[in-house]
């Protein structure tokens, strides 16, 4: 525990900035490089850093497996909901032009919402994969695959 004090202090300082940078990449993705996938991976990297430093159990207290599943569903529903909204408003699936009064405004709204859905889904997926793999105990592995 004592040998990790520097890592714990530095990570407590860095993690909020990592998550803030993920939000910047998310919202800047409409105007330049970046977007949902990149932001989702950066956000998940911040969570994974927390899990590595403080442990997977402590990280799961912050974001439970059930909450991660809910985020997965919300991300997919947001993405597909924008597509369905385009159909209901008289356009094609994922036709952003019909989402606002002007085509440019509709594209802006549509891209932000779709990229946000992608970001949520990617972050939740990467977090789920990490916690599933990192949360296994060696005994469980040996029972399932035998001793090597």
Could you describe each region identified by the protein language model?
Residues 55-60, 83-98:
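Transmembrane alpha-helix boundary signature
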Residues 101-116:
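Short aromatic-rich membrane-water interface segments that cap or initiate transmembrane helices
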Residues 5-7, 42-66:
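Cytoplasmic juxtamembrane interface segments
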Residues 69-85:
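Hydrophobic alpha-helical membrane-insertion segments
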Residues 45-51, 114-128:
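Hydrophobic cores of alpha-helical transmembrane segments in multi-pass inner/ER membrane proteins
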Residues 30-43:
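Short, non-helical or kinked segments that cap or interrupt transmembrane helices
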Residues 1-9, 135-148:
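Extramembrane terminal tails and long inter-domain/linker segments of multi-pass membrane proteins
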């Amino acid at each position: 525990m004592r040998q990790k004090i520097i890592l714990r202090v530095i990570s407590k300082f860095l993690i909020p900035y990592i998550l803030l940078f993920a939000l910047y990449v998310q919202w800047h993705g409409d105007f330049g490089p970046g977007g949902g996938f990149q932001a989702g991976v950066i956000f998940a990297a911040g969570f994974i850093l927390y899990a590595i430093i403080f442990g997977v159990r402590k990280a799961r207290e912050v974001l439970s497996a059930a909450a991660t599943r809910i985020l997965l569903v919300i991300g997919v529903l947001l993405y597909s909901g924008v597509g369905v909204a385009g159909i209901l408003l008289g356009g094609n699936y994922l036709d952003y032009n019909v989402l606002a009064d002007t085509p440019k405004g509709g594209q802006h709204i549509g891209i932000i919402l779709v990229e946000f859905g992608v970001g949520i889904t990617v972050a939740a997926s990467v977090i789920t994969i990490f916690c599933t793999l990192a949360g296994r105990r060696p005994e469980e592995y040996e029972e399932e695959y035998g001793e090597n």
